[in-house]
Structure formats: C-alpha cells, structure tokens
C-alpha cells in the first residue's frame, strides 16, 4: 500500500471490525504495561521504612495509584503502612498486577480474533450491504456504560458499601489509611481536599452519564446537527475523544501538582507549595508552642514531633527541586534518609535565638543568613572574609539540637556551626545514606513531578491533535478540493447560464 508512517491508521477507515481490533490491542498494551510495571516496582520496592523511605522517595509510580484505591497488602507478607500480615487476600498488589496481565492476554487474543474475523454481520448496514457504524447509538452505549461504572465506583467502592474505600489522611499526611468515605452533598464537597467530594461527584456524574446515555440511545440527532457536526464521520469521533482525553489530562495535572484529596502526600510526596508556604514548618512550630505553653522543656516538645512530619519539612522532598533530565528516584539523588538529627536552634553570644533563612524552591545555591525574631540579620557565612561583619566567628554563634538523634548536643566551634547552618537552609536536618545506591547528591523530583510533567505535555500534544482532526472532519470537503455544489454547477440545465448560481432555474 506504501503509506507514509503518519497515515497508517487509514487502514482501519471504513473497516469497523479491525477498528475494534486495534482498540482492543491498545487496551491489551495498556493493561499489560500496568501489570508488568507493578510487578517490576514490587520487585525493587523496600517496604521496611514507610516513614523515611516511603514509596514516593523510592520512585514508585503505579504502587501509589493502587494504594489510593484501597490496596495495602502484599503476598510478600508486608503492609504498606508497616508491619507484617498473614492473610493479604486475592486483591493484594501482586493480585492486581496479575489480574491486569491476565486481562491483557485475553484482550490480545480478542484483538487477533477481531482482526481475522473482521467482516461481521453486526457491522453491515442491511440497507446498503456496506460496513457502517451507527455512531450516535454507539456514543449512547458508551456514555451509559461509563456512567454506570462512574456511579458504581462512587456509590460502592469509595463509600465502602461494596469495596475497600479509598486512602484518606489528615492535612499533614501523618495518619493515612484506607477507609470508607461518606458522600459530601453540601458546599464542602467542592473543596478539592475533602474526600467526600470524590464519592458525591462520582455518584452525581455517573447518574448524569446514565441519563445522558439513555437519552442518546432513545433520541436521534436532528438532521441539520448530524450534518453540521459531521456525526457520520469516524474522524469526528476521534476528534471529540481526543478533546475528552486532553481535558482530563489537564485536570489531573492540576490536581497532582497543586494537591488534592485524590493525590495524598503520603503516596505521592508533598507539593512544592507546601515548602514555599512553610506549611509543615508552621505546624511544627504550632505544636512546639503548644508544648511550651504546657511548661514542657524544649527537649520534650521537640522529641514529640513525629519524624514523618519533620521529614516533610525538608527541601529534598520538594518535587520542584528535580531537574528536567535528572532520571531516577529521590533516593538516587540526596540518598536514603536514615534518621532525623533533631531541630537545630542557633544563638549568638548575647543569647538571641537566630533563624536560618530557608532556600527558595528555584535556587540551587543561597547565602547562609541568620536573622533574629524581628527579621534583623545577625549572622551569616560571608562570601569575602575581609568584608565580613556578621560572620559566625565574629558573632559567636552556637547551635544546640532538640529532638532527634542529637537531642541535647550543642556545638560552638565555627566550622561545625556553619555546617549545620548550611544544612538548616534545606529545612529539618536528616542523616542521608548516599553509599547504598551511589546517590550523587543532586535533588530529584518525586512521582508527583513526573506525573504532572507527563500529563501536561501530552495534554498540549492532544490539544493540537483535537484541533487537527476536528478541522479535518469539519472542512473535509475544502481540504479535498471538492465543492459540495460542484455537481450542481456542471449539471446541464441546472442554471440558465452554465456555472452561474444566480441564474438557478426554478422548478415548475
């Protein structure tokens, strides 16, 4: 046939049987990739430390999606929340992966069957004897089935009526677990961070889809609309399908990057805005202030800060710190977190508490500046020693740790103080193992960053595809160079003067 690579899909034009076949094969490839990727991730995943080495630090991509839908146990005897289990059941991580691979194999066989047996009676228009598809009817069927699945997910799976529920956590990602969710029918259901909105919106959208599907099955489109939107052309279906997909891709890119109830930080890592706004730092200080108000010592209150909360307050977990071509997991960058060293409190020789200015997201290097409670600069690590006025040596800065592994330890020698001041720029200080994975010390992004980048990129690409195929189907006659009135113009007797549409003969 000699088709160029960008026109190979014309082989399934006007061939409904093989059009169905290639779509089934595509489903086989997608399901096969998902199952295989899940098995690969399970082979390399280390579940031993869900606090300091969670799935998102290890670069897991499909495990978080399984987990948010209610899968938490493995046939390997471990649970995602830590600890061991004896009876994981069939719907474990491996069970879901296996189901996808089996489904992929069945789709593969079905695709081959439909490719061989393409000329089925069901695809034949009995009036013309030619292959054709009733596209508005197919649209109604698909809309009805999609609505049914959407309603079922919201009403049964999410609510726990028949299913496990979904992953739900607190605002600081500390107490997450799989649980059933009640639908939120009030205005709070529109809050993207309220899990109840997931149930209610799926129920509402599913109901709408079912009703719309029944409408399109029972009502035929008006002839003018049918012709105007080219409803008989399969490329119209392609164009509108691409529109639905790119719109969905833009939406999920947004919910992933900015955060929502559907993208919990325990599964995908924190967002960059939580670092920018000092979200976890504020919560830590709130807890410390509450403890001090109850006459607890600094050592006591900082020792009660959960290691998980402190770990979120570290710039290495910011998904925007990864570079565009830095492949690999976060653990391959700054290393595997081993333990929290504690919170460093810096003081000058006059006893003032000093705070290290934190590094903004888009800086690779940043000056070490220590300010007091009023924001006045009191100490720094100068670029030129000859010009310095506020150097650690001159100001006499000391550091003492509270909580963590160095609880109660203090340092006064300038070299050590400057070392911890530099590290305090990056948030809470952790001991990181860079030897095990030969980590290079350069920050990586989390799956949150990869997902956003991938879906935003493909959304832009698919937007172009929608415009392209929409234009092709709407202006097919123009692109083909065929004027719809051409036959009328050359027909003998249609016009009093040949080719002049203003002299059209009137029918008597």
UniProtKB/Swiss-Prot annotation:
TM region(s), chain numbering: 21-36, 101-115, 140-156, 203-218, 237-252, 457-472
Gene3D superfamilies on file: Photosystem II CP47 reaction center protein (3.10.680.10)
GO cellular component: chloroplast thylakoid membrane; photosystem II
One example of a Gene Ontology biological process annotation: photosynthetic electron transport in photosystem II
Keyword Repeat: no
Bilayer topology annotation: Multi-pass membrane protein
Gene Ontology molecular function: chlorophyll binding; electron transporter, transferring electrons within the cyclic electron transport pathway of photosynthesis activity
Note on cofactor: Binds multiple chlorophylls. PSII binds additional chlorophylls, carotenoids and specific lipids.
Entry's localization field: Plastid, Chloroplast thylakoid membrane
Keywords: Chlorophyll, Chloroplast, Chromophore, Membrane, Photosynthesis, Photosystem II, Plastid, Thylakoid, Transmembrane, Transmembrane helix
Keyword Membrane: yes
InterPro entries: PS_antenna-like (IPR000932), PS_II_antenna-like_sf (IPR036001), PSII_PsbB (IPR017486)
General function of this protein: One of the components of the core complex of photosystem II (PSII). It binds chlorophyll and helps catalyze the primary light-induced photochemical processes of PSII. PSII is a light-driven water:plastoquinone oxidoreductase, using light energy to abstract electrons from H(2)O, generating O(2) and a proton gradient subsequently used for ATP formation.
Oligomer status and interactors: PSII is composed of 1 copy each of membrane proteins PsbA, PsbB, PsbC, PsbD, PsbE, PsbF, PsbH, PsbI, PsbJ, PsbK, PsbL, PsbM, PsbT, PsbX, PsbY, PsbZ, Psb30/Ycf12, at least 3 peripheral proteins of the oxygen-evolving complex and a large number of cofactors. It forms dimeric complexes.
Family of this protein: Belongs to the PsbB/PsbC family. PsbB subfamily.
PANTHER family membership: PHOTOSYSTEM II CP43 REACTION CENTER PROTEIN (PTHR33180), PHOTOSYSTEM II CP47 REACTION CENTER PROTEIN (PTHR33180:SF38)
Name of the featured protein: Photosystem II CP47 reaction center protein
GN (gene name): psbB
